């Protein structure tokens, strides 16, 4: 068995070689994240898509498109989702409005640069005046990207992709209206200006982030969630879980710097703030009451409705505050998938569902960050059901970690990274894949060295 020193030694050997890859050529970025002496920001912004929530609101989709004056509408989904009765309601509503939808049904669960390029090519081959995304986060993110690149037909794929993998070009072209209809209670993508994908050339998870990508409307219809299989409900629910915990424990917005020279340059992920905290607390309270029921009682409309609402609320929260280490560590986990094929997911290709990749490291992450903001860790644990009345602040990280672990055990989540096919020898590559995620890892309340990251992955090989 390898010890941590051996892992770090190998990781440093790999990182120190000559490498022109933009994702892997900045091995000291994270350890230097607090060295900036620039002026800190003193303001935060709150923005979100318009949200309409309620059972059956999908029936109103046709009217919404009519109100936009839309004539040519691209509907982005996948073949399996389009067969669901609740989704057919939305398609029928579009047709009743006198609009013939043009379907793109080749969405890949956990999109890649290749699957996104297919969607881009499809969108560019038409002249749509509106987009509709129906499905989980994969469908909504694919639709956002198709909308962006069909608006800027000369753009190369990496132009808008986040640095260091892409060029993070500012979005200045006007996008078409996009309406999102989420069918899972997880990503909150209907509220955010973020699209995430696997960049296969580097085996790395990355994304595109711009307020311009936000849907103009999210139709949050909990009837869609009744079709979620048990494992899908669990994995998606843990994405909500970590969105709320990470945004609530992110650095305060006043600790983020530098202050933007122009307010339009203020990043979407700004750090925890009083308004995002409201959404995070609401989501955690809802999770405490309804998460287990929503997974194990698929016909429980109340529980699944509440988790769908929690997904949206957490999305509003993290869409403005940000996420940090659980998500930063999750990207190489998903990008370096081996042969894991989860229950409840259609398609034969190996994937690690996003929510699963995120929660795998959550116990080790919150144990690591607990000392940096103990009061918030204890408050979160208390909301989630832990008895914190006589707890000491020094134990905050361990208490929240144990609380997360209990939820994972109750909902039968796989026992750590080893259950997904990873071992000690993979840790250098996992660390290396985390380094490009500084955009979000720098929002963690505690800075991380490469050795810290290796330790977090090592501790996450088993959870129970």
Swiss-Prot record:
CDD domains in the cross-refs: HOT
Catalyses which reaction(s): (S)-3-hydroxybutanoate + 2-oxoglutarate = (R)-2-hydroxyglutarate + acetoacetate; 4-hydroxybutanoate + 2-oxoglutarate = (R)-2-hydroxyglutarate + succinate semialdehyde
One BP annotation, GO: glutamate catabolic process via 2-hydroxyglutarate
Pfam hit, one: ADH_Fe_C
GO molecular function list: alcohol dehydrogenase (NAD+) activity; hydroxyacid-oxoacid transhydrogenase activity; metal ion binding
GO annotation, cellular component aspect: mitochondrion
Keywords noted in UniProt: Mitochondrion, Oxidoreductase, Transit peptide
Main location (coarse class): mitochondrion
InterPro entries registered for this protein in UniProt: ADH_Fe/GldA (IPR001670), ADH_Fe_C (IPR056798), Alcohol_dehydrogenase_Fe (IPR039697), HOT (IPR042157)
Subcellular localization(s) per the UniProt record: Mitochondrion
Coiled-coil intervals: none
EC id: 1.1.99.24
Role, per record: Catalyzes the cofactor-independent reversible oxidation of gamma-hydroxybutyrate (GHB) to succinic semialdehyde (SSA) coupled to reduction of 2-ketoglutarate (2-KG) to D-2-hydroxyglutarate (D-2-HG). L-3-hydroxybutyrate (L-3-OHB) is also a substrate for HOT when using 2-KG as hydrogen acceptor, resulting in the formation of D-2-HG.
UniProt similarity note: Belongs to the iron-containing alcohol dehydrogenase family. Hydroxyacid-oxoacid transhydrogenase subfamily.
The name this protein goes by in its record: Probable hydroxyacid-oxoacid transhydrogenase, mitochondrial
Organism the protein comes from: Anopheles gambiae (African malaria mosquito)
Lineage, highest ranks first: Eukaryota, Metazoa, Ecdysozoa, Arthropoda, Hexapoda
């Amino acid at each position: 068995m390898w010890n941590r020193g051996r892992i770090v030694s190998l990781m440093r050997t790999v990182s120190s070689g000559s490498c022109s890859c933009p994702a892997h050529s900045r091995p000291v970025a994270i350890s230097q994240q607090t060295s900036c002496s620039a002026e800190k920001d003193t303001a935060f912004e709150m923005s979100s898509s318009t949200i309409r929530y309620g059972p059956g609101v999908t029936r109103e989709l046709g009217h919404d498109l009519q109100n936009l004056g839309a004539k040519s509408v691209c509907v982005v989904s996948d073949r399996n989702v389009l067969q669901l009765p609740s989704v057919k309601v939305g398609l029928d509503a579009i047709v009743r409005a006198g609009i013939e939808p043009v379907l793109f049904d080749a969405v890949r669960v956990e999109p890649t640069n290749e699957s996104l390029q297919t969607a881009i090519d499809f969108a560019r081959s038409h002249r749509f005046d509106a987009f509709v995304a129906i499905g989980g986060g994969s469908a909504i993110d694919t639709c956002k990207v198709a909308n962006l690149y069909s608006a800027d037909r000369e753009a190369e794929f990496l132009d808008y992709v986040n640095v260091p993998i892409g060029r993070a070009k500012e979005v200045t072209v006007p996008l078409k209206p996009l309406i999102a209809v989420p069918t899972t209670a997880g990503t909150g993508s209907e509220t955010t200006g973020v699209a995430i994908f696997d960049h296969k050339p580097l085996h790395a998870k990355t994304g595109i982030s711009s307020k311009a990508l936000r849907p103009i409307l999210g139709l949050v219809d909990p009837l869609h969630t009744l079709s979620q299989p048990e494992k899908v409900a669990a994995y998606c629910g843990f994405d909500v879980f970590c969105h709320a915990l990470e945004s609530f424990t992110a650095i305060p917005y006043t600790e983020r710097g530098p202050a933007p020279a122009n307010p339009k340059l203020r990043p979407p992920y700004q750090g925890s703030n009083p308004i995002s905290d409201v959404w995070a607390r609401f989501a955690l309270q809802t999770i405490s009451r309804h998460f287990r029921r929503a997974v194990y009682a698929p016909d429980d409309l109340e529980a699944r409705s509440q988790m769908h609402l929690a997904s949206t609320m957490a999305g509003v929260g993290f869409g403005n505050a940000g996420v940090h280490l659980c998500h930063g560590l999750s990207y190489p986990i998903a990008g370096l998938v081996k042969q894991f094929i989860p229950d409840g997911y259609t398609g034969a290709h190996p994937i690690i569902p996003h929510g699963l990749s995120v929660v795998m490291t959550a116990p080790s992450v919150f144990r690591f960050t607990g000392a940096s903001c103990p009061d918030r860790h204890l408050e979160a644990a208390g909301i989630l059901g832990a008895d914190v009345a006589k707890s000491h602040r020094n134990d905050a990280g361990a208490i929240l970690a144990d609380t997360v672990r209990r939820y994972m055990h109750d909902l039968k989540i796989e026992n750590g990274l080893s259950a997904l096919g990873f071992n000690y020898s993979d840790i250098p590559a996992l660390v290396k894949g985390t380094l490009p995620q500084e955009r979000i890892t720098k929002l963690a309340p505690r800075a991380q060295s490469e050795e810290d990251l290796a330790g977090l992955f090592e501790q996450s090989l088993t959870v129970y």
